A protein has these predicted regions:
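Glycine-rich phosphate/pyrophosphate-binding beta-alpha loops
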Residues: 89-122
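Gly/Pro-rich interdomain helix-loop hinge
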Residues: 113-183
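Active-site pre-Tyr helix/loop in NAD(P)-dependent dehydrogenases
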Residues: 40, 106, 129
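Carboxylate- and glycine-rich phosphate/diphosphate-binding segment that chelates Mg2+/Mn2+
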Residues: 2-98
Length: 183
């Protein structure tokens, strides 16, 4: 996948209408939801992250964790679809200012070479990259990811926060039937 960017490609207005998502198949809903989660998590732990991008990304993570499964299970769930449309937009507001990370760097060629949907490739790679990045200065942020995903982080150490965040991502991915392996 080649990315081309030009200021003339940036729209003046973006219309995000959850009603247009009602007919999306479950697999597409799951994959695009995990793509949005990957956007939020990658840009939250990227070295360029700062207080404003963190605010957007934590809210997006929370909204996705609370609504993605419902949107996958029932495509006509108005509240879940609306929350997911807002969450993906909020995640985009954050990552457009700080960038993404190695998950997307690897997901693009994975999708191209193995015909893997982009969101599925992201979902497969995200937990492993999170574990790898846990050795970085971003490690203290993982406990906030876990908390945003609904984990009770009271009294957790940094290492426990990392594990909880990774496990929460894996659990959400599995709950919406994202393949857990490439084959």
């Amino acid at each position: 996948k080649m990315v081309c960017v030009d200021p003339n490609d940036i729209p003046a207005v973006a219309i995000v209408d959850p009603e247009l998502m009602y007919s999306m198949p479950k697999g597409l809903t799951a994959a695009t939801g995990m793509d949005a989660l990957t956007h939020a998590i990658e840009s939250y732990i990227t070295p360029g992250a700062w207080v404003m991008s963190d605010m957007f990304e934590l809210k997006a993570i929370e909204m996705i964790a609370q609504n993605l499964k419902a949107a996958v299970d029932n495509g006509k769930d108005v509240a879940a679809r609306e929350a997911m449309s807002q969450a993906q937009y909020i995640a985009g507001m954050g990552f457009s200012n700080v960038g993404l990370g190695i998950v997307h760097s690897m997901a693009h060629p994975l999708g191209a070479f193995y015909d893997t949907p982009h969101g599925v490739a992201n979902a497969l790679l995200l937990p492993y990259v999170m574990e790898y990045n846990a050795e970085s200065p971003a490690a203290p942020k993982y406990i906030h990811i876990a908390k945003a995903m609904g984990v009770d982080t009271t009294g957790m150490s940094e290492a426990e926060g990392v594990k909880a965040a990774v496990e929460a991502v894996k659990a959400l991915s599995a709950s919406i039937n994202i393949p857990q392996k490439l084959h």
